[in-house]
UniProtKB/Swiss-Prot annotation:
Compositionally biased intervals (Basic residues): 273-285, 467-477, 1101-1112
GO CC annotation terms, alphabetical: core mediator complex; mediator complex
Disordered: annotated span: 86-108, 238-298, 399-481, 580-617, 694-736, 1035-1158, 1372-1407
Keywords per UniProt: Activator, Coiled coil, Nucleus, Transcription, Transcription regulation
SUBUNIT field: Component of the Mediator complex.
Biased composition (Low complexity): 1056-1070, 1124-1143
Gene Ontology MF: a single term: transcription coregulator activity
Name of the protein: Mediator of RNA polymerase II transcription subunit 26
Listed Polar residues bias regions: 401-414, 587-604
The family this protein is said to belong to: Belongs to the Mediator complex subunit 26 family.
Signal peptide (from-to): none
InterPro entries assigned to the protein according to its UniProt record, in alphabetical order: MED26, TFIIS/CRSP70_N_sub, TFIIS/LEDGF_dom_sf, TFIIS_N
Organism: Drosophila pseudoobscura pseudoobscura (Fruit fly)
Coiled-coil positions: 792-820
């Protein structure tokens, strides 16, 4: 944030506050605080503005706690930024922490150095990097140590230290350094180090004294041996309060000989500062006194013997203390860093400098202690330097920095990083101090000792005079300014002599800032030349250090990172105007210099450091890098050649950021040049566009990055004239051709895009004016005038008028142009050969499967969940393959690791259109479980299904007489009203929608009842998962005594009774009309009776379960009484059990309905209601499973309430119809039912309805017959629990063989079959159809479907089970009707059609047999149609209606009673519309919850395209039927798998489809000439069904509830 912004924020804040700093404008205050919280601020900015004061006053004055907290946190953040935070306590804490932490690293490092120090300083350095504290910097430190024993410590130390040392060393020439260092290292380092190592415990970090002395020596050697002799002042960062400081002082004193011999040698080993305790203070004082004495002794000139002794005693300590001293930074950030080293030293060996020795920034100790110790100044300094460096590296820098620089947030840095930084900083500082000492006080080596002595004396005097004050004051820095001023005035003196011995408790922002600058000014202490050289060296070192030291930059608090803290005082780091500013790094470099608060002295160095630091967010790391680089350069000397080589290798191995050139090159390589020219047109006031051909700018060089800008510009220049001319002559060129739109483009049409109009407004008028002026042509004028002058009629205007208008227009245009001149108009002259444009078009407009697949499967770094490698080498990779090869690790093999394609995880892809699918698998093959789309189907609850099954079994047991079993039909037969009552009763599961075929046979209900008695032997037909309870009971319990025989008898009986089963359609319609009221009553009755039944059924079920087992029916314990009233199937079954005659069935049917009603009421759990429409006539009780998801009987009771209560057409009743077919009245019904069984056979592939045993194909009819017979037995066992569905049991029961093919069939054949009143098993479920058992008025439409489906079901059932004589909604009286329905179904339902003949042949040679033969023929043709159903139920096959060979009039006649009559019979359609509207609406379409297609309103259901259109158009299903019947012949013609044109979607649609008239024609239904239109509900809608009971619904695939 720049100064202006800060000023602006300050002004805003001041305006928001009143004179008393009370908030006037809270929003403004909050906005300012938010802005400040999100930015960094520098000390200068804070000082230049009153912002901090405002915030502080705001914090104090405001009563808003939140605001106060935010203001306080903001101030705290600033404090941290500027480094104010570091208080005496902080420093103490820092010291204490590092003391504990650094010890292990230092010990480790020490071990390393101890091993190698004697032999070679370079080795020592190499080992030093190993220290955990210097992970990234180890290499650097190693390089430095190798390069120069004095430099190695910086290398080992964090880059900050290195930079400091480098700065100190800058003056020394590389050669001199190398020579002096090598010699000194070899000489002094071997003996003293060996002694030191021996004396010093391994745990203690070796004093880096030797290393630093090497650094200093190298520097001094460069400068001259005299400088070496000079004692370097070591500023112990460890303040009086720190034990480490005391210890360090003691250490220094302990090493006085070494120090004396090599003043530089005494490098403050980073001594972690423990928290300042009183004892610490005491120790410090003692240490100070000791250190002063030692220093004096050293200054006096201690000889090698003394030096060796002291080195042994406290050389390590001294070195550490020296490090701490050197690094003693204001606020003791460096001291804390160094104190870690001291802490590493044994506290016994640690000496604390006297308070007098301490400056405010830290204690300054002469390096003289070691100077006198060395016999040979050069040798001793070298050894000392080596030792010092070793000590530093040994000392965990991070410990010191963490301990000392808690305020600087060194703790945030990882310990190793901190250590490294501290070490490097310490080494750098020691080197710098030594160098600075040698440079600034260049004295002969002899004089060095004296000078160091004098310095020591001065330090002692100053320390005495300046007793360190307790750092009790945590906040505030009163009096610091004066100290700072003094420090700044005598920066060099303070640095060397500790003039500011007073301890700074807390530095103000100014102080911190000045310190930072002063640290940057480290070289200022040194001679100006030395400063320059040092700065350059430090830059190099910093650069190098930066390379190896990403850690500092990586940490958020890199500014506060220990490295920075170490290099600079933690406060200094904070002080950096920029947390990541170079200043911080510079300060870090000036750890020893931090003492001085004046930034001015070291301006050169600070600038250089700043430059380096700008590279890295962490100034320290930046400095370190620069220092490292410098050190690398200096270390090119032979001595450091190894280290230098290593460092260079490391640096080079680390790829730096790409240069601008490289980036540009890479960018060009990846970019396709755009050769299109963009020309800026400036319109003169006259409107003449001036084309500024931005030859270079136009063709954006950036875009043309691949090509040289020159070449690109040339191309553009070549093209420009043409383009300009085009723009002048051809205005069209001005407007770029409209790009092909992508999905991301706006939706504006070409002419509607406002942008174009805006552009035209800006661009067009001038051009037009220009043309007008240039051409002065009336045509042009006229042409432009209409555009500009709307009122002008060019044709009628005279030339003068036109000219006048033109002139006026030109004037206006000029004015507008003048206004618009400011807006640049750019014209893009597209190059037809532009590669970029071609690529764009290809990428945007030519996306094909390849691209899509590539997008899904190819590796894209950040796309498709692929990880993106940050490896810099990847950047240069031009291709993915290269990249992958480079990585050699990640390769896309199978694409499994890439985002999967949509639906790839699904068990099976769900085909949206199954019409093209042909199921060739044998009818016996089990359909794959996965074949069932999980999301489609009737929502069923397993519990409900189990209940239904158990209740069904109970009812079967209870209802011994098959006629009784046929009770649902019987109920219908007994009284259509009663049946409707049952239906309307809408027991949750039992929804009986009995649509009598329009007045087919009233006696049909009776016949059906009888047939039901017979048909109840067909458990499979009754096995609607929903209706199983009712249907199976009729089937299975046709005669509980002999179910097996009964089934066969039932088939026959069905046919015989089918004639009776038909009820008058009129009665059905009337029943439907009264359904709701009747159903309510029936509901109550049923609930009562059903309760009784349920009890009886349970008892009977257990008994008859055995019989079922005989029939291969597994009895399941009744979980709950299933409230599925399959048209009173359950109740009917129980009553049928009681009565053996169809009459009893009729009676029991009523009772059963009542019971079923009761069951419904009792069983609120029922998720679905089977809507059965009583088939009075041919047992075509329009039974369809109504998805009554509502468990509450009240909701489900009424067909309207029940989700599927009103299924538009029950084509599925065909199985019930089969039972009805078994009516005695219709001997042919057996045939039809047999033909229906083939339906399953035909379905072979689709065998949804058919059991495995059924083949889809007519040629397998015999097989189907056999299978039907077998499956009749197997049907007995119906798995209402859907166990087979979930367990994928092939046979839930032998009787459920058809059920096995769940996935091919939406429902099991038993599910689809219900016994008609005639006792015939009708297909209960017209998946999309309402009950179509009879061509009832209620469901003439539905009946058509049901008849089709029923025929199909009959075929299925007949083929599958003779018992399943599906008389498709044919009157029981007329086998023909049944047959006709069956043929309808057979044709529509390929299953039925294919197997109808066979079934007819095998099962029953009734009158219907002929009909079934016909049907079978049709079925044969319709095998393909069954394929249309795609393994769906025949009802879906019926949807295809490909088999609708029935004449449209016949269909209409047949469906006349059905909801939708065939369109051909308009009169019947009209009547049907009237009747069916009521019936279908009441029954079939009452499924409001299911969005059932209302006969006229059915817009949502889509059966066929025509039906769908009609439905959408709200045309009545009858009209749809008419249209559909028109399509039916076509569909019939298309007997293959492909459904008729509307059919392809039929499976998915709840459409109204006319039942094939052919089937109807076969029976008396043909006489009705009603086209039954079966309405299917879109399976999508089925998916939407929800369980009102919150009970998970099992959704069977493709079940149309309606």
């Amino acid at each position: 944030m720049n100064q202006n912004q800060i000023q602006q924020l300050t002004s805003h804040l001041s305006q928001a506050l009143d004179q008393n700093y009370d908030v006037v404008n809270m929003d403004a205050v909050l906005s300012v605080i938010c802005a400040l919280e999100g930015t960094t601020i520098t000390k200068e900015q804070l000082e230049a503005t009153r912002l901090a004061k405002y915030i502080n006053q705001l914090r104090r004055r405001t009563k808003n706690e939140h605001l106060a907290r935010r203001a306080k946190s903001l101030l705290k953040m600033w404090r941290e930024m500027v480094g104010i935070q570091q208080t005496a306590n902080d420093s103490q804490h820092h010291h204490s922490q590092p003391t504990s932490l650094p010890t292990p690293p230092s010990a480790h490092f020490y071990k390393y150095t101890a091993g190698s120090a004697d032999s070679n300083l370079t080795e020592t350095v190499v080992h030093l990097p190993v220290s955990p504290s210097v992970p990234s910097h180890r290499t650097i430190s190693d390089l430095h140590s190798n390069i120069d024993s004095s430099e190695p410590p910086p290398a080992v130390l964090p880059s900050q230290h290195q930079s400091n040392f480098l700065n100190l060393i800058n003056n020394i020439s590389k050669c001199e350094r190398e020579e002096s260092n090598s010699s000194m290292l070899i000489q002094a380092h071997k003996q003293p180090q060996s002694q030191q190592f021996q004396n010093r415990p391994l745990g203690l970090p070796l004093p880096f004294i030797s290393e630093q002395s090497l650094n200093s020596v190298s520097i001094s050697s460069d400068v001259g041996n005299d400088k070496k002799g000079e004692a370097s002042i070591v500023i112990d960062i460890v303040t009086d309060s720190d034990e480490n400081d005391n210890e360090s002082a003691s250490t220094i004193q302990g090493k006085p000989t070494a120090a004396a011999s090599a003043p530089f040698t005494i490098s403050p080993a980073p001594c972690p500062r423990p928290k300042k305790f009183k004892k610490d203070k005491k120790h410090k004082e003692r240490d100070r006194s000791k250190s002063s004495l030692l220093a004096q002794n050293e200054l006096i000139g201690q000889h090698s013997s003394r030096y060796s002794a002291k080195v042994k005693e406290g050389q390590s300590q001294t070195a550490q203390a020296t490090d701490s001293e050197i690094f003693s930074l204001s606020n003791s950030s460096m001291s804390s860093i160094l104190s870690g080293d001291a802490a590493l030293l044994n506290p016994q060996h640690k000496f604390r400098a006297n308070a007098s020795e301490l400056t405010f920034t830290g204690r300054f100790k002469p390096v003289n202690h070691l100077d006198s110790a060395n016999q040979d100044n050069s040798a001793l300094p070298i050894g000392q330097n080596i030792v010092f460096r070793q000590n530093e590296s040994e000392r965990p820098i991070f410990e010191d920095s963490i301990t000392n620089d808690s305020s600087t947030s060194c703790s945030r840095l990882s310990p190793p990083t901190v250590e490294e930084r501290r070490k490097s900083d310490k080494i750098d500082d020691s080197i710098r101090q030594q160098i600075a000492t040698s440079i600034q006080m260049p004295m002969p080596s002899i004089g060095l000792g004296h000078e160091s002595n004098s310095r020591t004396e001065y330090l002692e005097n100053s320390s005495k005079s300046q007793v360190p004050k307790k750092r009790g004051r945590k906040k505030g820095s009163k009096g610091v300014d004066a100290v700072i001023a003094k420090e700044s005035s005598s920066l060099s003196q303070q640095i060397f002599f500790g003039v500011g011995s007073t301890v700074k408790k807390v530095k103000t922002t100014k102080e911190l800032f000045s310190e930072i600058q002063s640290r940057k000014l480290i070289t200022a202490v040194q001679s100006p030349t030395s400063n320059i050289s040092n700065s350059s060296i430090s830059r190099e070192l910093t650069t190098r250090a930066l390379m190896p030291r990403p850690t500092s930059s990586c940490s958020d608090t890199s500014i506060h990172s220990p490295q920075i803290m170490e290099t600079y005082s933690g406060n200094v780091t904070l002080m950096g105007v920029d947390k990541f500013s170079n200043k911080n790094e510079d300060a870090g470099n000036t750890d020893s210099d931090t003492i001085t608060s004046e930034p001015s002295q070291d301006s050169n160095k600070s600038q250089e450091i700043k430059e380096c630091t700008s590279l890295d967010s962490n100034s320290n790391s930046l400095q370190t890098l620069s220092l490292a680089k410098k050190s690398m350069h200096t270390s090119k000397s032979e001595n450091y050649s190894d280290v230098t080589t290593q460092l260079m290798h490391l640096i080079h191995s680390i790829k730096g950021p790409l240069s601008v050139y490289e980036v540009e090159k890479l960018y060009r390589a990846q970019i396709v040049p755009c050769t299109c020219l963009v020309i800026e047109e400036i319109c003169n006031p006259f409107g003449e566009p001036i084309n500024l051909s931005s030859d270079n700018g136009v063709g954006d060089p950036k875009s043309d990055s691949n090509n040289d800008n020159v070449s690109r510009h040339k191309k553009q220049e070549e093209q420009l004239p043409k383009l300009e001319r085009l723009s002048d002559n051809d205005f069209s060129m001005d407007t770029p051709q409209k790009p092909v739109k992508s999905i991301f483009d706006l939706d504006f049409d070409e002419d509607e895009d406002p942008l174009q109009s805006i552009i035209n407004d800006i661009r067009m008028p001038p051009t037009k004016l220009e043309e007008t002026k240039e051409n002065a042509d009336l045509k042009n004028a006229l042409a432009h005038l209409p555009m500009n002058i709307s009122s002008l009629d060019v044709a009628s205007v005279n030339a003068d008028t036109v000219q006048n208008q033109i002139n006026s227009h030109n004037q206006e245009g000029e004015t507008s142009e003048e206004q618009n001149v400011a807006i640049p108009v750019f014209t893009c002259h597209e190059d037809p050969d532009c590669v970029a444009k071609q690529r764009f078009h290809v990428q945007t407009n030519k996306v094909n499967n390849f691209h899509i697949n590539a997008l899904h499967n190819f590796y894209i770094p950040n796309i498709n969940g692929n990880w993106d490698s940050i490896d810099s080498s990847i950047v240069s990779e031009s291709t993915i393959t290269d990249f992958l090869n480079t990585l050699g690790s990640y390769t896309v093999t199978d694409g499994a690791d890439v985002v999967p394609k949509y639906g790839s995880l699904t068990y099976d892809r769900i085909r949206k259109d199954l019409s093209s699918i042909k199921f060739t698998s044998s009818f016996k093959t089990r359909p794959l479980k996965s074949f069932m789309p999980p999301f489609l189907g009737v929502a069923k609850c397993l519990p409900t299904c189990r209940l239904a099954r158990s209740s069904f079994k109970k009812k079967q047991i209870q209802s011994p007489p098959p006629p009784l079993i046929v009770i649902p039909s019987t109920i219908e037969g007994l009284d259509p009203d009663i049946m409707q009552k049952d239906y309307n009763g809408g027991s949750p599961l039992k929804v009986d929608v009995d649509v009598l075929v329009s007045g087919h046979d009233n006696n049909e209900s009776n016949v059906q009842m009888q047939v039901n008695l017979q048909t109840k032997s067909d458990p499979t037909l009754s096995y609607n998962l929903l209706k199983l309870a009712n249907d199976e009971l009729p089937f299975e319990e046709t005669e509980p005594n002999d179910k097996g025989s009964e089934y066969e008898n039932q088939d026959n009986g069905r046919f015989s009774s089918s004639s009776n089963s038909s009820c008058s359609n009129s009665s059905n319609s009337s029943l439907k009309k009264t359904q709701d009221s009747i159903n309510e009553k029936l509901r109550n009755q049923r609930s009562q009776r059903y309760r009784v039944q349920s009890v009886e059924e349970e008892t009977n079920r257990k008994r008859r379960g055995k019989n079922r087992k005989k029939r291969n029916i597994k009895e399941n314990p009744p979980i709950k009484r299933i409230k599925i009233s399959l048209n009173g199937t359950i109740s009917n079954l129980s009553s049928s059990n009681n009565s053996s005659s169809s009459e009893s069935e009729t009676e029991t049917g009523l009772e059963n309905e009542n019971e079923v009603e009761n069951d419904y009421e009792n069983n609120n759990d029922e998720e679905y209601a089977v809507v059965q429409r009583p088939t009075c006539g041919d047992g075509a009780s329009n039974n369809h499973i109504v998805m009554t998801i509502k468990k509450t009987p009240s909701k489900i009771n009424s067909p309207a309430n029940s989700m599927s209560a009103t299924s538009p057409i029950n084509a599925s009743e065909t199985r019930n119809v089969k039972n009805a077919f078994s009516d005695s009245n219709r001997p042919n019904l057996l045939t039809s039912s047999t033909s229906i069984a083939p339906l399953y056979q035909i379905d072979g592939g689709r065998r949804l309805l058919l059991s495995k045993k059924f083949s889809r194909r007519p040629h397998r009819r015999r097989r189907y017959r056999q299978c039907r017979r077998k499956s009749d037995l197997q049907r007995k066992a119906i798995d209402l629990e859907l166990k087979h569905l979930f367990t994928y049991k092939t046979k839930p029961d032998l009787d459920i063989g058809s059920a096995i093919k769940l996935h091919k069939k939406l429902f099991f054949s038993h599910e689809l079959c219900k016994q008609n009143t005639a006792g015939r098993k009708e297909r209960i479920l017209n998946y999309s159809s309402s009950s179509s058992s009879n061509y009832d008025d209620d469901e003439s439409d539905l009946d058509g479907l049901s008849s089709e489906e029923t025929a199909a079901d009959l075929k299925e059932n007949v083929n599958t089970f003779n018992k399943y004589n599906l008389n498709i909604e044919t009157d029981n009286t007329s086998a023909e009707r049944t047959v006709s329905e069956d043929p309808l179904k057979i044709e529509e339902d390929p299953y039925l059609t294919s197997s109808s003949n066979d079934v007819t042949d095998s099962d029953n040679e009734s009158d219907n047999h002929e009909v079934f033969d016909e049907v079978a023929k049709r079925v044969e043709a319709d095998e393909f149609n069954e394929l249309h159903n795609n393994g769906m139920l025949t009802s879906f096959n019926s949807i295809s209606v490909e088999n609708q060979l029935i004449n449209e009039p016949t269909l209409m006649a047949v469906s006349g009673s059905v909801d939708t009559p065939a369109p051909q019979s308009n009169a019947s359609l009209a009547s049907l519309q009237n009747e069916n509207c009521d019936d279908v609406n009441n029954l079939c379409y009452n499924n409001n919850n299911l969005d059932v297609i209302k006969h006229s309103l059915a817009a949502s259901p889509i059966l066929n395209d025509i039906n769908y259109k009609n439905v959408i158009s709200n045309t009545s299903p009858r009209v749809l039927a008419n249209k559909f019947s028109d399509c039916i012949p076509q569909n019939i013609g298309n007997s293959e798998l492909s459904p008729p044109i509307p059919l392809p979607c039929a499976e998915y649609q709840t459409g109204i489809r006319p039942a094939p008239l052919t089937d109807l024609a076969l029976s008396s239904y043909a006489d009705f000439r009603c086209t039954r239109i079966q309405q299917f509900k879109e399976w999508h809608q089925v998916l939407q069904l929800q369980s009102y009971n919150n009970e998970p619904l099992i959704v069977l695939p493709y079940v149309v509830l309606e």
